[in-house]
Every structure is written in C-alpha cells, then in structure tokens.
Amino acid sequence: MAGSSSLLRAGIRNVLLMQMRRSSDQLGELGKGAGKGGGGGGSVREAGGAFGKRQAAEEERYFRQKEQEQIASLRKHHEEEIRHHKGEIERLQKEIERHKSKIKKLNDD
C-alpha cells in the first residue's frame, strides 16, 4: 500500500515536472514572456514582466494545491479500503470459528 502511494506521488510529481520543463523550454524563465522579445501580445503570462511572473506563480500554486488535493483524496480512499478489508477479515474469522465449532460438534457426537 505504501509503495503504491509513493509511486503515484512520484508519478504525479514527474508529470508536473515534465509540464513545467516543457513550458519553461518554450518561455525561457516562467513569467518572463514568450521568446526574447518579451511577449507575444497574448495572455498575461506570455506578455512577461511582473504580471507574467505573478501569473506563473499563481499557476504553480494552483497545480501544487491540486496535487495536494489529489493526494488527500487518494489517502482517504485507501483508508476507506483498509477499513472495509478489516471488516471483511473480522467477518470471515467469525465464519471460520463458526465452521470450526460445527466440526467440533460433529466430532463430539
């Protein structure tokens, strides 16, 4: 269980890093603008300058928050699965004891 969550966490982190690298290859430094000219006249981030840097920082914050939400959701899901399986184990152990008592009763007769 712990291995799968760490693999998923590493996978999410790798995907985000790849996205950041792709965008940083295209833009140079995040928020600096498109190419050396300082922006393409499109979005705020492409325009560069202080607003571009702010937009880049907000995007990074957004993705970090989404990653944390996904990890929390996954953790909750695994905890629910563990709780369910523990309940199943208890139920099956009671069934085993019930069958053992039936066998013992048959042997005693």
From Swiss-Prot:
<dbReference type="GO" id="GO:0030218">
    <property type="term" value="P:erythrocyte differentiation"/>
</dbReference>
<dbReference type="GO" id="GO:1905707">
    <property type="term" value="P:negative regulation of mitochondrial ATP synthesis coupled proton transport"/>
</dbReference>
<dbReference type="GO" id="GO:0042030">
    <property type="term" value="F:ATPase inhibitor activity"/>
</dbReference>
<feature type="compositionally biased region" description="Basic residues">
    <location>
        <begin position="99"/>
        <end position="109"/>
    </location>
</feature>
<keyword id="KW-0175">Coiled coil</keyword>
<feature type="compositionally biased region" description="Basic and acidic residues">
    <location>
        <begin position="55"/>
        <end position="69"/>
    </location>
</feature>
<dbReference type="GO" id="GO:0042803">
    <property type="term" value="F:protein homodimerization activity"/>
</dbReference>
<feature type="compositionally biased region" description="Gly residues">
    <location>
        <begin position="30"/>
        <end position="43"/>
    </location>
</feature>
<feature type="compositionally biased region" description="Basic and acidic residues">
    <location>
        <begin position="77"/>
        <end position="98"/>
    </location>
</feature>
<feature type="coiled-coil region">
    <location>
        <begin position="71"/>
        <end position="109"/>
    </location>
</feature>
<dbReference type="GO" id="GO:0051117">
    <property type="term" value="F:ATPase binding"/>
</dbReference>
<keyword id="KW-0809">Transit peptide</keyword>
<comment type="subunit">
    <text>Homodimer; represents the active form and is present at a pH value below 6.5. Homotetramer; represents the inactive form and is present at a pH value above 7.0.</text>
</comment>
<comment type="similarity">
    <text>Belongs to the ATPase inhibitor family.</text>
</comment>
<keyword id="KW-0496">Mitochondrion</keyword>
<feature type="region of interest" description="Disordered">
    <location>
        <begin position="27"/>
        <end position="109"/>
    </location>
</feature>
<dbReference type="GO" id="GO:0006783">
    <property type="term" value="P:heme biosynthetic process"/>
</dbReference>
<protein>
    <recommendedName>
        <fullName>ATPase inhibitor, mitochondrial</fullName>
    </recommendedName>
</protein>
<comment type="function">
    <text>Endogenous F(1)F(o)-ATPase inhibitor limiting ATP depletion when the mitochondrial membrane potential falls below a threshold and the F(1)F(o)-ATP synthase starts hydrolyzing ATP to pump protons out of the mitochondrial matrix. Required to avoid the consumption of cellular ATP when the F(1)F(o)-ATP synthase enzyme acts as an ATP hydrolase. Indirectly acts as a regulator of heme synthesis in erythroid tissues: regulates heme synthesis by modulating the mitochondrial pH and redox potential, allowing fech to efficiently catalyze the incorporation of iron into protoporphyrin IX to produce heme.</text>
</comment>
<feature type="transit peptide" description="Mitochondrion">
    <location>
        <begin position="1"/>
        <end position="22"/>
    </location>
</feature>
<dbReference type="GO" id="GO:0051289">
    <property type="term" value="P:protein homotetramerization"/>
</dbReference>
<dbReference type="GO" id="GO:0005739">
    <property type="term" value="C:mitochondrion"/>
</dbReference>
<feature type="region of interest" description="Antiparallel alpha-helical coiled coil region">
    <location>
        <begin position="78"/>
        <end position="109"/>
    </location>
</feature>
<dbReference type="InterPro" id="IPR007648">
    <property type="entry name" value="ATPase_inhibitor_mt"/>
</dbReference>
<feature type="region of interest" description="N-terminal inhibitory region">
    <location>
        <begin position="27"/>
        <end position="56"/>
    </location>
</feature>
<dbReference type="Pfam" id="PF04568">
    <property type="entry name" value="IATP"/>
</dbReference>
